[in-house]
Amino acid sequence: MVQTSSPLEDDHTHHHHHDFHTDAEDSPFALTKQSSLRDYLYNNKLWVEKMNDHKPGLFDINGKGQSPHTLWIGCSDSRYNENVLNVSPGEVFAFKNIANMVSIDDLTTKSTLEFSINVLKVKKIIVCGHTDCGGIWNSLSYKDLGAANSHLMDYLTRIDRLRDEKIDELNKISDLKLRAKRLAEFNVVKQLDILRQQKVVINALNKEEIELWGLVYNVDSGYLEVVEA
């Protein structure tokens, strides 16, 4: 059984256990690859205290259930998530995977759409890609990830097909970062197109119960941009 309380019993003696970045006292990151379970639980305690200070009553509200306004379909990239909207826990139902894909043959995707639209009654669906996406870069570099990553390679063939469809326009962009951003935008549009073909989405759109938005997050500035679809 996992102990959930003992690591936090003595906060005063705990601080020296933290494995923060030794090369930068002012690092923005809370944990590192060397952090222990104790560190993770201590940070959770700090987070709860911060939330109770800044948003009192939030946990009481969330304890009674959820009624999110938005379904967020984003990339699993560690540098962004729905919190870039400055929302609180309980506002956004999130679905994330590599390169923010909507897979019509995937049971997880289909059930997520049905649950968020039919049960939770979200009013917005956002597909949000981002700059400097590894899946996008891999496609543009025509890189072979090797046999050990065969499932990943198969997964990313959808990006490769999109790259091939848009290759003429992409090749007109000489700046590689801008080219990658453009393919990320194309990918957002593609996923929105796939969403609009799903029965549960079609029904909700016909009833004017939901809106679909496409966004791209800039990892180097924190700002979102609208993708015209």
Where are these regions (language model features)?
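Divalent-metal-activated hydrolytic enzyme cores
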Residues: V2-S67, S88-G90, A99-S111, F115-K123, ...
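Conserved H-X4-D acyltransferase segment
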Residues: Q66-S76, Y80-E82
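Short beta-strand segments
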Residues: I73-C75, K96, I126-H130, W213-N218
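Solvent-exposed loop/turn segments at secondary-structure junctions
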Residues: S78, C133-G134
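Catalytic core of membrane glycerolipid acyltransferases/transacylases, capturing the structured
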Residues: S78-I98
